[in-house]
Curated annotation (Swiss-Prot):
Coiled coil: none annotated. The lineage of its organism: Bacteria, Bacillati, Bacillota, Bacilli, Lactobacillales. One of the essential components for the initiation of protein synthesis. Protects formylmethionyl-tRNA from spontaneous hydrolysis and promotes its binding to the 30S ribosomal subunits. Also involved in the hydrolysis of GTP during the formation of the 70S ribosomal complex. Residues 453-457 are annotated as: G2. Residues 302-313 have a biased composition (Basic residues). It comes from the Bacteria. Residues 148-158 have a biased composition (Basic and acidic residues). This is Translation initiation factor IF-2. GTP binds at residues 428-435, 474-478, 528-531. It comes from Pediococcus pentosaceus (strain ATCC 25745 / CCUG 21536 / LMG 10740 / 183-1w). Residues 419-588 form the tr-type G domain. Residues 528-531 are annotated as: G4.
């Protein structure tokens, strides 16, 4: 059996949770609130304890729930919704039907009618009325025979009953006029032995439906809440054909004659209603007489409502007039008024705890007329402070938007310094084994997920060696990612230079050495791939000595470790060297100050928004901290470590991925945590404004000096490109690589570059600009793809940067106008000429060199001078048109639009050949 909570046990044994908690705590059980759980033994103990209490104490009678009427303001007894009417019980005899009786018989008779005892001294006119089914005249009680036709004696009895009812109705009306308030509240009480529901006012209400010509009397006993303020009126029949009545009606709700026992039988014949009996008739248009007796009470209710409204209004007015005006306590003046440049009266009033009107009055007496929003100069502020007898001190303004200065100040903080893990950057040439080394260190498979085996983004990871943490940054090795690698060198403490033993020093190896030296970062050389055939570690050492990296074995200070990342050889030795170098550097940070650090990578996620991978360099970052990163700001919503788990804080040298920024920062931006969100927002907005102004300043305006260059650029063709990538570093790298492509006569024009998937806005821009969209590790959305198909926009998707660069270069070369050069293909000597009308001069000749074609261009040369240049009109051999005549054959030809051909002329045939762009 499972554990049970306190509130569940309280419901089962009908005891409040508070009592159970007090009892459990008194017995030494470990419970705190109603959600605490109990084992089986504790539950059994508490059940027995409260069972004994309930058997020894007398059961408390259930109190009738009361509520305060929203209309009259009086407390009335709340009724239950529906009484249970059971027509199967036997008929019980009425007990104590005396007018002065205070008990009520709540037993149900067999016909479903309930007898109600009158408690206000009125005659009890309730009667048991038959419950006849619709369209049926048979008696539901089978043991009662139908009554025969009335005799004269019964007629006399009925007449006397009607007379008695009329007299009773008249008496009740007189009583109601004298005491209209007597019927406001009716209390019901039951005998101790009777079972009844508390707070119910059972009423016998007739349900008279005239259907199919039969006058069927149906009694529907519905107990409804007794609302004091309802107007007493007999409403038309509802769907259930029950008339609701309230306590604001006269005491004789249904003044029916006290019929003898013979009248309780169900008569199958027609049954007449007494005109003056005051019964509730549910037929439409009924109750012509019974409803008139309620009119005095309706008037009285309206008067009562008016009196109540007037009393409430008078009470509110009285409270307003008697309200005491609180006197504001005057706060003491501060010792020093600290003001800033351009402070106004309203701000001074807040600082010295005085009203602005008082300060304006003082300034007016000094001859200075200002309002509370006007700025005051420093002299006026000092005079005002002297008048109040306090010292004025100008506040030193700090530029909170200069986060670089704040970052440097945080780095210089030398209090509460503790050791921190080293940050290690792995650098090297393409395919020299950087990612494989990190893969071996982390026991994961990063390389398999990289496109083409090349690391396309920057990653940050932590691992533990000898109970000490080491943070690794994996910067990509391709030359296009120079900026990313430079940013990685700025945040690192130690650089591991991976060099393949079979390849030696390569261009990116030299570049990595220069970055590390520029950042004053110590270098540990890892000579990789020593397991391969042809590996020569000594040759690598000789090459690196040219760049100042001399091994310790050769008398230098550079650590060299020969490893095999693939086999895991000497990996532990490399980690030991890293920890040894970290001890020499004495890396420390203050975890108690506000966090500061750098952005490793940033991207826009469709589900999470702006995401930034950051490295905390100083202080401790917490979830919820207000932060400014570059030109963006926000409050940290989530922090995720390299394993994808959420963390609440990040200590120095810890890489985390954060969300909650208002934009995507640039990779390499610095960040600073502020004390409050207001300051962070102000700093972020100010930095964004300054960046926008600098961008506008960088825009090139046409001057006389650069006018010619601008015109020359206008002659050049351009390739409009839109770049979308997964991370900011990839966007920058791809843009720089494309702009470095050199094709004479064509230039790259990047009209838009951003992080994220290719969307409809990008396609719209490309369609308007006739641009090509290049997606790097991203895909277009379904809507964007559909729009691109309809707009004929070219979208090129790539995962490797080489392919993207080559494709754009090919497109640039294809945009140049084709270059043609002339090629001489043949020569014809003219030996005979014929003049034919309608055709012109026909020349007969012999092909001496090459060949001549029908579509080739020709030149007519006479005595070494070109006389005419044009096209062939026709080319024939004998009488047949031919396309080509080769060397050694005779031919006949005509020159288009030229007839001055003479014997001895030479016709040179040529064609224009397209030269490919280099």
């Amino acid at each position: 059996m499972g554990k049970k909570r306190i509130y569940e046990l309280a419901k089962e044994i009908n005891v409040s949770s508070k009592d159970i908690i007090e009892k459990a705590q008194a017995d030494g059980l470990d419970v705190k609130n109603h959600m605490s759980t109990l084992d089986d033994a504790s539950e059994k103990h508490l059940r027995n304890a409260f069972k004994k209490n309930t058997t020894t104490t007398k059961p408390e009678e259930k109190r009738t729930p009361k509520f305060r009427s929203s209309k009259t303001g009086k407390t009335v007894v709340k009724k239950s919704d529906h009484p249970a009417a059971d027509g199967t019980k036997g008929i019980q005899r009425l007990k104590s039907s005396n007018n002065e009786s205070t008990t009520r018989n709540n037993n149900n008779n067999k016909n479903g009618n309930q007898n109600r005892n009158n408690t206000n001294g009125r005659p009890n006119n309730n009667q048991n009325r038959p419950n006849n089914n619709r369209n049926q005249n048979n008696n539901r009680n089978g043991n009662r025979p139908n009554q025969p036709k009335r005799d004269e004696k019964q007629d006399r009895i009925r007449a006397s009953v009607a007379e008695a009812a009329r007299m009773a109705a008249q008496a009740n009306r007189e009583i109601a006029n004298e005491k209209p308030q007597a019927n406001r509240q009716r209390t019901n009480s039951a005998k101790p032995g009777e079972q009844r529901r508390e707070g119910r006012n059972n009423q016998n209400r007739p349900n008279n439906n005239n259907r199919n010509g039969n006058n069927v009397n149906r009694t529907n006993n519905n107990n409804r809440p007794n609302n004091n303020n309802r107007n007493n009126e007999n409403r038309p029949s509802r769907p259930n054909n029950t008339n609701q009545t309230t306590n604001n009606r006269p005491a004789n709700n249904t003044t029916r004659p006290a019929a003898p026992a013979a009248t309780t039988a169900n008569n199958s014949g027609e049954k007449k209603q007494d005109r003056f009996s005051g019964r509730n008739n549910n037929s439409r248009g009924g109750n012509r007489f019974g409803n008139n007796q309620n009119r005095p009470f309706n008037k009285e209710n309206r008067k009562n409502k008016k009196r109540n409204r007037k009393a409430k209004r008078d009470g509110r007015m009285k409270e307003t007039t008697n309200k005491v005006v609180t006197v504001r306590k005057e706060r003491p003046l501060p010792d020093v008024l600290e003001y800033s440049e351009g402070i106004n009266v309203a701000e001074i009033a807040k600082k010295i705890h005085r009203e602005p009107a008082e300060i304006i009055k003082k300034l007016f007496m000094m001859g200075v007329m200002v309002n509370q929003n006007q700025s005051l100069d420093n002299d006026t502020v000092e005079l005002l402070a002297a008048d109040y007898g306090i010292e004025a001190q100008q506040k030193v303004e700090v530029d909170i938007s200069d986060i670089d200065k704040i970052f440097e100040d945080e780095e210089k903080n030398t209090t509460n310094l503790v050791s921190r893990p080293p940050v290690v950057t792995i650098m090297g040439h393409v395919d020299h084994g950087k990612t494989t080394l990190l893969d071996k260190l982390r026991h994961s498979h990063i390389t398999e997920g990289e496109a083409g085996g090349i690391t396309q983004g920057i990653g940050a990871y932590q691992l533990k060696h000898d109970d000490k943490l080491i943070t690794f940054l994996d910067t990509p090795g391709h030359a296009a990612f120079t900026e990313m690698r430079a940013r990685g060198a700025d945040v690192t403490d130690i650089t591991i230079l991976v060099v393949a033993a079979d390849d030696g020093v390569m261009p990116q190896t030299i570049e990595a050495i220069n970055h590390a030296k520029a950042a004053n970062v110590p270098i540990i050389v890892a000579v990789n791939k020593i397991d391969k055939q042809g590996a020569n570690p000594n040759h690598v050492m000789e090459q690196l000595t040219e760049y100042g990296l001399i091994p310790e074995s050769w008398g230098g200070d550079t650590i060299f470790v020969e490893i095999s990342a693939k086999l895991g050889q000497n990996i532990d030795e490399l980690l030991d060297m890293i920890l040894l170098q970290a001890e020499v550097l004495e890396l420390k940070a203050n975890p108690d100050q506000n966090a500061a650090g750098s952005v490793i990578e940033a991207q826009l996620d469709p589900g999470k928004g702006s995401i930034a991978t950051i490295l905390v360099q100083q202080g401790t970052m917490h979830v919820g901290d207000p932060i400014v990163i570059g030109n963006t700001f926000g409050r940290i919503r989530t922090m995720v470590n390299e394993h994808g788990r959420r963390v609440k804080e990040a200590t120095p040298s810890t890489p985390v991925e954060i969300t909650g920024l208002n934009g995507v920062p640039e990779a390499g931006d610095r960040f600073v945590v502020f004390d409050d969100e207001k300051s962070a927002r102000a700093a972020g907005e100010e930095r964004a404004k300054r960046a926008q102004m600098e961008e506008r300043k960088r825009s090139n305006h046409v001057t006389l000096d650069n006018l010619f260059d601008s015109l020359k650029e206008g002659e050049m063709k351009k390739v409009d490109i839109i770049i979308k990538a997964d991370v900011q570093g990839s966007v920058e790298a791809l843009a720089d690589s494309l702009q470095k492509i050199e094709v004479e006569g064509v230039r790259v024009n990047i009209i838009h570059k951003a992080v994220g998937a290719i969307n409809e806005s990008d396609v719209t821009l490309a369609a308007a600009s006739n641009a090509i969209i290049i997606g790097f590790n991203v895909r277009p959305t379904a809507q964007a793809k559909q729009m691109a198909d309809s707009e004929d926009v070219d979208i090129r998707l790539h995962r490797v940067i080489y392919n993207a660069i080559d494709e754009v270069e090919s497109a640039m070369k294809g945009m140049l106008e084709p270059v043609y050069e002339e090629e001489i293909i043949g020569q014809v000597d003219i030996r005979e000429t014929y003049k034919v009308s309608r055709v012109g001069t026909i020349a007969g000749g012999f092909v001496t060199e090459g060949f001549i074609t029908r579509d080739s261009g020709v030149r007519l040369i006479r005595d070494g001078v070109v006389i005419y240049e044009g096209k062939l009109g026709s080319l024939k051999r004998f009488k047949d048109d031919v396309k080509e005549v080769k060397r050694g054959f005779e031919l006949g030809l005509t020159v288009e639009n030229y007839n001055d051909i003479k014997i001895g002329d030479v016709i040179e045939a040529y064609r224009m050949k397209e030269v490919p762009v280099e």
